């Protein structure tokens, strides 16, 4: 069972596991109605601060600083201006931190500190919460702190008004991972009584534990296959397709395990899907919809379901506000948000092109393929093609060296995205003629 210990000794998994008892304690105290709303905000904020210091060490200041600045902007700016300024500041700060990682990896050729990598991951999640909250304020979904820091209220009153914002940005169940929780859901959970029955919560968490166990068993089996076979540097021709597919499968299994663990921590604290929702409130969106991800034959569906809460956040933040080339802008911003490593830039641009091709290809197929056997054959073929393209994109995004990216581009795996590129050009030309 050493492999199971390796999962829980993974830096983020370890700290997420350490936070579990405190998440259960918070939920229990809410069920018992044992402490006030302000005490709940303080509990979540203090837990977030302690977890940040434990996991990140001195790098925690890189998360605390933008959180404090974001709250200052949220409380001092007019609702119409708040999103522009918070977005610019947050992405500038995150980009500077990512440049530090680039300097370490590409200039010094040194492996980055594990604590620094955890900090960057947490900072990316903080960017999601900051921009989500600023958009809510800008759109009138959340009422900004009245008066803000410009009013003549005392310091203690300012702090009390800003406490929900601080707590939301740094609350410990979502500090290191987990689906994006809107400020409305967060506030409703903290201010209301828990809708989570202890027995139901126990079975839900047990089911998630079994899922993690099963995924880790698969992870071990696939990793042994990958280790026993050739790598991307020494594979030959069609063998490279198998290498990329199995390696991408290993990445996916790892993502699924960690997403379910993150989801379990949120659920243990009472922020899971069983929470009662007020009218018009956005529901809980889990990141790991494994069933849909593994059976879909459409790249566009995979894109919407992969890391689902982040996909929705990107759609709201970029896609819905883009006037020209919204799809390309969304994936380009995703590459920026992830850190602009060469593989990420290539991978996300390729992903955008594949989604655009996917729309045209399936629209054309639905128009001309009528018989049931042909539809089944078409669905099977496009499922396999989708899985191979996703594997190609995933490896491009995950590799850090230009040499590895070059090997991937020169392998037979490049045939699959090239087929979609050719079909995109042909179908786009046909669509233009029809119009």
UniProtKB/Swiss-Prot annotation:
<dbReference type="GO" id="GO:0030258">
    <property type="term" value="P:lipid modification"/>
</dbReference>
<feature type="topological domain" description="Cytoplasmic">
    <location>
        <begin position="429"/>
        <end position="435"/>
    </location>
</feature>
<dbReference type="GO" id="GO:0016747">
    <property type="term" value="F:acyltransferase activity, transferring groups other than amino-acyl groups"/>
</dbReference>
<feature type="topological domain" description="Lumenal">
    <location>
        <begin position="102"/>
        <end position="120"/>
    </location>
</feature>
<dbReference type="InterPro" id="IPR049941">
    <property type="entry name" value="LPLAT_7/PORCN-like"/>
</dbReference>
<keyword id="KW-1133">Transmembrane helix</keyword>
<feature type="topological domain" description="Cytoplasmic">
    <location>
        <begin position="27"/>
        <end position="40"/>
    </location>
</feature>
<comment type="function">
    <text>Catalyzes ghrelin acylation at 'Ser-3' using preferentially octanoyl-CoA, hexanoyl-CoA and decanoyl-CoA as acyl-CoA donors leading to ghrelin activity. In vitro also uses acyl-CoA donors of different lengths from short-chain (C2) to long-chain fatty acids (C16) knowing that acyl-CoA donors from butanoyl-CoA (C4) to dodecanoyl-CoA (C12) are more efficient compared to longer acyl-CoA donors, such as myristoyl-CoA (C14) and palmitoyl-CoA (C16) that are not efficient.</text>
</comment>
<dbReference type="InterPro" id="IPR004299">
    <property type="entry name" value="MBOAT_fam"/>
</dbReference>
<keyword id="KW-0812">Transmembrane</keyword>
<keyword id="KW-0256">Endoplasmic reticulum</keyword>
<dbReference type="GO" id="GO:0005783">
    <property type="term" value="C:endoplasmic reticulum"/>
</dbReference>
<feature type="transmembrane region" description="Helical">
    <location>
        <begin position="60"/>
        <end position="76"/>
    </location>
</feature>
<dbReference type="GO" id="GO:0016486">
    <property type="term" value="P:peptide hormone processing"/>
</dbReference>
<feature type="topological domain" description="Cytoplasmic">
    <location>
        <begin position="262"/>
        <end position="324"/>
    </location>
</feature>
<feature type="transmembrane region" description="Helical">
    <location>
        <begin position="325"/>
        <end position="338"/>
    </location>
</feature>
<feature type="topological domain" description="Cytoplasmic">
    <location>
        <begin position="77"/>
        <end position="82"/>
    </location>
</feature>
<comment type="subunit">
    <text>Monomer.</text>
</comment>
<keyword id="KW-0472">Membrane</keyword>
<feature type="active site">
    <location>
        <position position="338"/>
    </location>
</feature>
<dbReference type="GO" id="GO:0008374">
    <property type="term" value="F:O-acyltransferase activity"/>
</dbReference>
<feature type="transmembrane region" description="Helical">
    <location>
        <begin position="41"/>
        <end position="56"/>
    </location>
</feature>
<feature type="transmembrane region" description="Helical">
    <location>
        <begin position="408"/>
        <end position="428"/>
    </location>
</feature>
<dbReference type="GO" id="GO:0018191">
    <property type="term" value="P:peptidyl-serine octanoylation"/>
</dbReference>
<feature type="transmembrane region" description="Helical">
    <location>
        <begin position="83"/>
        <end position="101"/>
    </location>
</feature>
<feature type="transmembrane region" description="Helical">
    <location>
        <begin position="377"/>
        <end position="397"/>
    </location>
</feature>
<feature type="topological domain" description="Lumenal">
    <location>
        <begin position="1"/>
        <end position="5"/>
    </location>
</feature>
<feature type="topological domain" description="Lumenal">
    <location>
        <begin position="339"/>
        <end position="340"/>
    </location>
</feature>
<feature type="topological domain" description="Cytoplasmic">
    <location>
        <begin position="358"/>
        <end position="376"/>
    </location>
</feature>
<feature type="transmembrane region" description="Helical">
    <location>
        <begin position="121"/>
        <end position="136"/>
    </location>
</feature>
<feature type="transmembrane region" description="Helical">
    <location>
        <begin position="6"/>
        <end position="26"/>
    </location>
</feature>
<feature type="transmembrane region" description="Helical">
    <location>
        <begin position="207"/>
        <end position="227"/>
    </location>
</feature>
<keyword id="KW-0012">Acyltransferase</keyword>
<dbReference type="GO" id="GO:0005789">
    <property type="term" value="C:endoplasmic reticulum membrane"/>
</dbReference>
<protein>
    <recommendedName>
        <fullName>Membrane-bound ghrelin O-acyltransferase MBOAT4</fullName>
        <ecNumber>2.3.1.-</ecNumber>
    </recommendedName>
</protein>
<dbReference type="GO" id="GO:0016412">
    <property type="term" value="F:serine O-acyltransferase activity"/>
</dbReference>
<feature type="transmembrane region" description="Helical">
    <location>
        <begin position="341"/>
        <end position="357"/>
    </location>
</feature>
<feature type="topological domain" description="Lumenal">
    <location>
        <begin position="228"/>
        <end position="240"/>
    </location>
</feature>
<feature type="transmembrane region" description="Helical">
    <location>
        <begin position="241"/>
        <end position="261"/>
    </location>
</feature>
<keyword id="KW-0808">Transferase</keyword>
<comment type="similarity">
    <text>Belongs to the membrane-bound acyltransferase family.</text>
</comment>
<dbReference type="Pfam" id="PF03062">
    <property type="entry name" value="MBOAT"/>
</dbReference>
């Amino acid at each position: 069972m050493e492999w199971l210990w390796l999962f829980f000794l993974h830096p983020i998994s370890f700290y997420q596991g350490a936070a579990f008892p405190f998440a259960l304690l918070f939920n229990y105290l809410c069920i018992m109605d044992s402490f006030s709303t302000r005490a709940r905000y303080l509990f979540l904020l203090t837990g977030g601060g302690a977890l940040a210091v434990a996991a990140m060490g001195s790098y925690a200041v890189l998360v605390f600083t933008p959180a404090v600045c974001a709250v200052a902007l949220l409380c001092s700016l007019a609702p119409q201006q708040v999103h522009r300024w918070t977005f610019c500041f947050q992405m500038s700060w995150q980009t500077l931190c990512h440049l530090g990682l680039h300097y370490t990896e590409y200039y010094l050729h040194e492996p980055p500190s594990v604590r620094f990598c955890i900090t960057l991951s947490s900072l990316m999640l903080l960017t999601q919460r900051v921009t989500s909250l600023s958009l809510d304020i800008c759109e009138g979904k959340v009422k900004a702190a009245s008066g803000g820091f410009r009013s003549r209220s005392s310091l203690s009153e300012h702090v009390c008004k800003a406490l929900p914002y601080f707590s939301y940005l740094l609350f410990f169940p979502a500090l290191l991972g987990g689906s994006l929780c809107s400020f409305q859901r967060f506030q409703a959970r903290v201010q209301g009584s828990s809708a989570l029955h202890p027995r139901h919560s126990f079975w839900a968490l047990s089911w998630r534990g079994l899922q993690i166990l099963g995924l880790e068993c698969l992870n071990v089996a696939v990793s042994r296959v990958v280790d026993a076979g050739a790598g991307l540097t020494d594979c030959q021709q069609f063998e490279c397709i198998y290498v990329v597919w199995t390696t991408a499968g290993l990445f996916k299994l790892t993502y699924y395990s960690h997403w379910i663990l993150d989801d379990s921590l949120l659920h243990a604290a009472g922020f899971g899907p069983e929470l009662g929702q007020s009218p018009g409130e956005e529901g809980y969106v889990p990141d790991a919809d494994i069933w849909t991800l593994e059976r879909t034959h459409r790249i566009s569906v995979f894109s919407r379901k992969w890391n689902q809460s982040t996909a929705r956040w990107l759609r709201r933040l970029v896609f819905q506000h883009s006037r020209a080339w919204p799809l390309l802008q969304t994936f380009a911003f995703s590459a920026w948000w992830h850190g602009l490593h060469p593989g990420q830039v290539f991978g996300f641009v390729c992903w955008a092109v594949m989604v655009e091709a996917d729309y045209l290809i399936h629209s054309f197929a639905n128009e001309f393929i009528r018989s049931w056997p042909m539809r089944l054959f078409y669905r099977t073929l496009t499922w396999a093609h989708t899985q191979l393209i996703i594997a190609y994109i995933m490896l491009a995004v995950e590799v850090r060296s230009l040499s590895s990216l070059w090997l991937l581009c020169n392998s037979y795996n490049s045939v699959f995205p090239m087929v979609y590129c050719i079909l995109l050009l042909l179908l786009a030309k046909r669509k233009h003629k029809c119009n």
